[in-house]
From Swiss-Prot:
Alphabetical list of HAMAP family matching this protein: Gln_tRNA_synth (MF_00126)
Residues binding ATP, per UniProt: 35-37, 41-47, 231, 263-264, 271-273
Residue interval(s) of motif 'HIGH' region: 34-44
GO cellular component labels: cytosol
Residues engaged in binding L-glutamine: D67, Y212
Protein name: Glutamine--tRNA ligase
Main location (coarse class): cytoplasm
Organism: Nitrosomonas europaea (strain ATCC 19718 / CIP 103999 / KCTC 2705 / NBRC 14298)
Keyword Transit peptide: no
Catalysed reaction, written as an equation: tRNA(Gln) + L-glutamine + ATP = L-glutaminyl-tRNA(Gln) + AMP + diphosphate
Position of sequence motif 'KMSKS' region: 270-274
A Pfam family recorded for this sequence: tRNA-synt_1c_C2
A biological-process GO annotation: glutamyl-tRNA aminoacylation
Keywords per UniProt: Aminoacyl-tRNA synthetase, ATP-binding, Cytoplasm, Ligase, Nucleotide-binding, Protein biosynthesis
Amino acid sequence: MNTPSSPAHFIRNIIEEDNRTGKWNGRVETRFPPEPNGYLHIGHAKSICLNFGLALEYGGVCHLRFDDTNPEKEAQEYVDAIIESVRWLGFDWKEHLYYASDYFDQLYEFAEYLITQGKAYVDSLSADEIRRLRGTLTEAGTNSPYRDRSAEENLDLFRRMRAGEFPDGVHVLRARIDMASPNINLRDPVIYRIRHIHHQRTGDKWCIYPMYDYTHCISDALERITHSLCTLEFEDHRPLYDWVLDQLAEKIPCHPQQIEFARLNLTYSVMSKRKLIDLVENKLVDGWNDPRMNTLAGLRRRGYTPESIRLFAERIGISKADSWIDMTILEDCLREDLNERALRRIAVLDPVSLIIDNFPDGHEETCYAPNHPQKPELGTRELRLTKQLYIDREDFMEIPNKGFFRLAPGAEVRLRYAFIIKCTHVVKDDQGKILEIHCVYDPDTKSGTAGAETRKVRGNIHWLSATYAKAVEIRLYDRLFIDSHPDTEGKDFKISLNPNSKEVITGYVEPSLCEAQPEQRFQFERHGYFVADLADTGPGKPIFNRTVSLRNTWKK
């Protein structure tokens, strides 16, 4: 896999220093630990590229581990989608696929050990009472009345919790740390709770489940992770990460280092999984893989390439400071990649009939268009010119504005790869809509011949033969939100939805495009980049999605 060049950043500097001092004996093991309660989005791609990229760069491995400790919200559908998305991005975890539930037995044994060491206790307060006694950022918490239960009583209660004797919410297991700590995460955090619910992998074996802060540091240690990379919201959780591993130092093979970096904040997007679920469940989009969604499944269906997303992740870099990344950076990475790989084709999206009156009836001219103007080795394709053509309606103006150099009454333009034509008159319906544009052509001006150089015109428009063009469904996608910051706190993000984010039309394309395969990408000349829809394209019946326009049309 080709990866962009790797500029220095603070995490790479940490790894370099660790390798210099021999801290991990040259090992670099990272992990990407998603919770299977939704589809991955572009923000996850930054973490995926960072974790897998660093492991690849330093000859290490990156684990894919599912944090499946909350069975109420998790499903196999999400596991499968996450696996597919990480693979699609171009990364391979080899044999290192893990689940937090793989460690449930060890996590339970470690919890019993913490109880025997006086480092954990069973609390019988309600969730509301625990929250009330936790205190605030400026006030210390208050000890639970159950904090001083004996180790024997705690062990008995914890085992009975596991045996299923108690309903949900009656007891929890808490770490005994410091209720007066200035870090609220160290005020006796809950590490186990009762949940009588079926787990997708362990079935009904367990009715108590470990909390994330307890689980993920131990999972890291058991997998011998060296550098545990997470986003900045976990910075205040790092003391708890270290506390748990310090208490279990005799039980675990290593103590990984947690390192935080700034998450991705992308304009015109929402990253909250809760809000993405809201969009899907309220049918404001057509599922998790809707091409307007910033999920990796949606971006893939929109026509994004893995290479463009990896380029984006590298280009925005890694830092400790939160900042906003403009959507145009992502789109420019996509344009840069598609400009290299997409074959050129012609499509007429809003057709109007054009008739060349002096073109002989039944006659055809073969014209030649390059498959890629920067790559002559990809050859040319044939376009058939006939008496009746389709052009895009926007390429004609009956009363042209100043600076309009396309077709107008009395004006001349070149038909791309073909001849110069001149508009003579138009035919309209009773409502004044133009039905036909009538022209004459100059047969001595065919592109690629000596005559093409004898006359120059400023306008150059694309066209398709009405005889050979094929009608197809084309979906014109645009940004899902009209507000650059729809996720602003205190604002209903749904009021920023773009009512014009999807338009379905019937357009005309070159006949060869009827054989387009799902995910095959093209540049529709003068329009933008399009892809044959991954989900809905059938044999001989492609549906094309607009991936991105040729240039940014959004005002900053």
